[in-house]
Amino acid sequence: MLAKRIIPCLDVRDGRVVKGINFEGLRDAGSILEQARFYNGELADELVFLDISASLESRKTTLGEVLKVSEEVFIPLTVGGGISSVERAHDAFMHGADKVSVNTAAIATPELISRIAEKFGSQAVVVAIDVKKVGNDYIVHTHSGKKPTQYEAMEWAHKVEKLGAGEILLTSMDRDGTKSGYDNVILKAISTSVNIPVIASGGAGNLEHLYQGFAEGHADAALAASIFHFRQYSIREAKTYLRERGIVVRL
């Protein structure tokens, strides 16, 4: 059985790590480099660097910061925000990214997923899917959650898999930053219907939530920010807790 992964996420804006609630009300969460160094030594399996305002402001990801982080960490680094072309993906890889995360640009041009996958391999392409519950449906949103799309979450998940995505980063906008637990309903629905790994995101508030994301949501990895950035828990604590409950993790 493949080990489940714990992935801290650096949401970056104006050169700092930030964290909000429901994609709003951003709070400073420290220095990018200090947080990256901390997680590199903390048993994190991977690290995600998301320039959360790049797509909203129609600009490139802050690649200078990406390069600095890549020189400090020796775990897989996923970079997202403003990856709107194969050229920008290439730039991210040249600055130390191991994977790129696409979201807004993939909705506008779904073929972008295929183009990046063909050039760099599916394993290097993560498609971030931000979902919000509207009535009984989970609707995909873009531009840092500001704009609803025509896609329902399950439909889009299947489409990106066919286009060559190697992984899905599924974020519940309703749960983001609330510390109320992952939305394991949509998480399970998508995780059990696609054949690529799904990363749970949005809502982790304690170690039991991580466990539930794996046990109930069938996630392959759990992404979290608030509980780790503000040192509520260490990743070592999280992995020990999970292992004691039968979840296979690397320690």
Swiss-Prot record:
Catalytic activity, as annotated: 5-[(5-phospho-1-deoxy-D-ribulos-1-ylimino)methylamino]-1-(5-phospho-beta-D-ribosyl)imidazole-4-carboxamide + L-glutamine = D-erythro-1-(imidazol-4-yl)glycerol 3-phosphate + 5-amino-1-(5-phospho-beta-D-ribosyl)imidazole-4-carboxamide + L-glutamate + H(+)
Protein name, per record: Imidazole glycerol phosphate synthase subunit HisF
Gene: hisF
Active site (record annotation): D11, D130
UniProt subcellular location: Cytoplasm
Cited function: IGPS catalyzes the conversion of PRFAR and glutamine to IGP, AICAR and glutamate. The HisF subunit catalyzes the cyclization activity that produces IGP and AICAR from PRFAR using the ammonia provided by the HisH subunit.
Phylogenetic placement of the source organism: Bacteria, Pseudomonadati, Chlorobiota, Chlorobiia, Chlorobiales
NCBIfam families per UniProt: hisF
Quaternary context: Heterodimer of HisH and HisF.
InterPro entries listed in its UniProt record: Aldolase_TIM, His_biosynth, HisF, IGPS_HisA/HisF, RibuloseP-bd_barrel
GO molecular function term, any single one: imidazoleglycerol-phosphate synthase activity
Cellular compartments per GO CC: cytoplasm
Short name of one Pfam family: His_biosynth
EC number, as in UniProt: 4.3.2.10
